[in-house]
Amino acid sequence: MNTQPTRAIETSGLVKVYNGTRAVDGLDLDVPAGLVYGILGPNGAGKSTTIRMLATLLRPDGGTARVFGHDVTSEPDTVRRRISVTGQYASVDEGLTGTENLVMMGRLQGYSWARARERAAELIDGFGLGDARDRLLKTYSGGMRRRLDIAASIVVTPDLLFLDEPTTGLDPRSRNQVWDIVRALVDAGTTVLLTTQYLDEADQLADRIAVIDHGRVIAEGTTGELKSSLGSNVLRLRLHDAQSRAEAERLLSAELGVTIHRDSDPTALSARIDDPRQGMRALAELSRTQLEVRSFSLGQSSLDEVFLALTGHPADDRSTEEAAEEEKVA
C-alpha cells in the first residue's frame, strides 16, 4: 500500500516579520505532490522568504508549515532529507570542471567515489553537457551554468525541488532547455515549487499557481481557472498606425461602455467585454469610420492581465536587479 503523503507542502497562517513588517502575513498553501506548483507575485511579495522558510533556511515567526507531513520547525533534518533548493545564482565552484562539481556534490551527499563519478556522468549526459564535462565552470555560458546548478541539486533525487527564479537572465533557447529539465523531473516523480518573474514560464510549466501579494495568497488555481476568474472575454486589436489610436479609443469606449486599455505597442488597444457580440459591433463601427484595423482577436484573458488585475502591477514592472534584491535580509 502506498503511504506517500498526497500533499507536498501545507502551510497555515505562516508569518515572517522583518523590522516590524510582515514579509509573509498569514500565508496558506496546499501543494499536491507530483506536480509543478508556481508562486507568482510582485517584487517584495514574500516569495523568496516563503521558500526559505519551507526549506528550513529561515525560522517562521508564526503559523505552521509541513513538507510531506513533517513540520519545518520541529523536524528540520527530516525535511532537509526530502528537499533540494536551487535558484538564479549558481551554487557551484567556478574553479572546478562540470564533472568535478557534480562528483564533489555526490561525495558531500555520502556517495562513494565510484558512485559519485557514475552519478556525475549520468547527469552531465542527461543535461546535455557532455561536450563540456571537462571544461572549467568559468568557461560555461549562463544557460550551461544554470543546467549544471540544477543537476547539482538533484545528485540525490529530491522528493521536492525548490526552483527560485531559475531562468532569470537566460536567453530563450536556454530557458526552453531548463523547462524540458523541469518537465522530466516531474515525470520522474519530483514535486517542483517554482517562483518566476516570467508569466509565460508559469503558463508553460505550472499545473497550479498561487498569486501572492503583501505576504498573502490572493488567488490560486490552474492557469485556466485564473484566466477565467476575470469573468470576461478580451478584445485585442492593432491599428494600421499609432495616429489612429486616440480616435479608435474614443469610439470603442462609446460603443462598448468599458475601459479601453492602451498596450505598450502604440498601435494596440484592448478591452474586457462580457458579450463577444459587443466586440463584433465595435469592429463594425470602426470599419464605418474608415479606421483601418490591422488585426484583432477575441479570447480569454492572458496570465499577464490576470496578474495586473489581481496585484495592480504589470508583470514586467520590475528589473532583474530588483528581483535579485527581493526580500534581502540583514
Swiss-Prot record:
Phenotype on disruption: Deletion of the drrA1-drrB1 operon decreases by 31% the daunorubicin (DNR) titer in cell culture. The drrA1-drrB1 mutant exhibits no growth defect compared with the wild-type strain and no significant change on DNR sensitivity. Deletion of the drrA1-drrB1, drrA2-drrB2 and drrA3-drrB3 operons almost blocks DNR production in cell culture, suggesting that disruption of these operons impairs the efflux of DNR, resulting in intracellular accumulation.
PROSITE patterns listed in its UniProt record: ABC_TRANSPORTER_1, ABC_TRANSPORTER_2
Annotated catalysed reactions: daunorubicin(in) + ATP + H2O = daunorubicin(out) + ADP + phosphate + H(+)
BP terms from Gene Ontology: daunorubicin transport; doxorubicin transport; response to antibiotic
Location of the protein in the cell: Cell membrane
Membrane topology: Peripheral membrane protein
Record EC number: 7.6.2.2
Record keywords: Antibiotic resistance, ATP-binding, Cell membrane, Membrane, Nucleotide-binding, Translocase, Transport
Matches recorded under InterPro entries: AAA+_ATPase, ABC_transporter-like_ATP-bd, ABC_transporter-like_CS, ABC_transporter_ATP-binding, DrrA, DrrA1-3-like_C, P-loop_NTPase
Domain of life where this protein originates: Bacteria
Binding, ATP: G41, P42, N43, G44, A45, G46, K47, S48
Pfam families: ABC_tran, DrrA1-3_C
Residue span, ABC transporter domain: 9-239
Cellular component, GO annotation: plasma membrane
SMART domains: AAA
GO molecular function, a single term: ATP hydrolysis activity
Stated role: Part of the ABC transporter complex DrrA1B1 involved in daunorubicin efflux. Responsible for energy coupling to the transport system. Confers self-resistance to daunorubicin, an antibiotic produced by S.coeruleorubidus.
Similarity annotation: Belongs to the ABC transporter superfamily. Drug exporter-1 (DrugE1) (TC 3.A.1.105) family.
Subunit structure: The complex is probably composed of two ATP-binding proteins (DrrA1) and two transmembrane proteins (DrrB1).
Protein name according to UniProt: Daunorubicin resistance ATP-binding protein DrrA1
Organism placement in taxonomy: Bacteria, Bacillati, Actinomycetota, Actinomycetes, Kitasatosporales
